[in-house]
């Protein structure tokens, strides 16, 4: 169970960083 918790925390951390980069620097497709 500990491995599952650690993988969950790792995925959530990477997801937060990924979305923060996207929302900070949005793609310029519309522009």
Swiss-Prot record:
InterPro entries on file: PSII_PsbT, PSII_PsbT_sf
Keywords from the UniProt entry: Cyanelle, Membrane, Photosynthesis, Photosystem II, Plastid, Thylakoid, Transmembrane, Transmembrane helix
Membrane-spanning intervals of the chain: 3-23
One Gene Ontology term from the biological process aspect of the record: photosynthesis
Gene that this polypeptide is encoded by: psbT
Species of the source: Cyanophora paradoxa
SUPFAM superfamilies: Photosystem II reaction center protein T, PsbT
GO cellular component: cyanelle thylakoid membrane; photosystem II reaction center
Description of how the protein assembles with itself and partners: PSII is composed of 1 copy each of membrane proteins PsbA, PsbB, PsbC, PsbD, PsbE, PsbF, PsbH, PsbI, PsbJ, PsbK, PsbL, PsbM, PsbT, PsbX, PsbY, PsbZ, Psb30/Ycf12, at least 3 peripheral proteins of the oxygen-evolving complex and a large number of cofactors. It forms dimeric complexes.
The keyword Nuclease is annotated on this UniProt entry: no
Task of the protein: Found at the monomer-monomer interface of the photosystem II (PS II) dimer, plays a role in assembly and dimerization of PSII. PSII is a light-driven water plastoquinone oxidoreductase, using light energy to abstract electrons from H(2)O, generating a proton gradient subsequently used for ATP formation.
Membrane-topology descriptor: Single-pass membrane protein
The family this protein is said to belong to: Belongs to the PsbT family.
Subcellular location: Plastid, Cyanelle thylakoid membrane
Superkingdom to which the source organism belongs: Eukaryota
Name of this protein: Photosystem II reaction center protein T
């Amino acid at each position: 169970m500990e491995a599952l918790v650690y993988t969950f925390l790792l995925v959530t951390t990477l997801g937060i960083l990924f979305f923060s980069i996207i929302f900070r620097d949005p793609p310029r497709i519309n522009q």
